[in-house]
């Protein structure tokens, strides 16, 4: 995969604040990684933005988290995730996404 912008399959639940989500990824090592991300980086399983009321307390959905591909090594990819970490994940949980449009004032 040559895309710089990717999605990672994960489990998503509500964070402590209305504009954040808790995500859980499976790492290439088999370990689970739990992090926090702004809601704008989280998507439903089919790639749609999460509605503000889509996550109820104590519920978890299967979804996607936005990430940047750092290195693709075939079966394993190194990605930067929204909480600032770089992790190794199985290439099987990575899917392509469209780059975000930059808005610059003139």
Labelled PLM ranges:
Residues 1-106:
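Single-stranded RNA-binding regions, centering on S1/OB-family and related RNA-binding modules
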């Amino acid at each position: 995969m040559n895309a710089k912008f990717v999605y990672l399959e994960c489990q998503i639940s509500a964070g402590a604040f209305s504009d954040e989500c808790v995500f859980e990824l499976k790492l290439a090592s088999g370990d689970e990684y739990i992090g926090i991300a702004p809601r704008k980086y989280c998507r439903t399983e089919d790639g749609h933005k999460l509605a503000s009321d889509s996550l109820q307390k104590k519920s978890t959905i299967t979804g996607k988290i936005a990430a940047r591909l750092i290195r693709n090594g075939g079966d394993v990819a190194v990605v930067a995730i929204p909480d600032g970490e770089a992790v190794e994940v199985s290439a099987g949980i990575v899917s392509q996404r469209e780059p975000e449009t930059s808005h610059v004032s003139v």
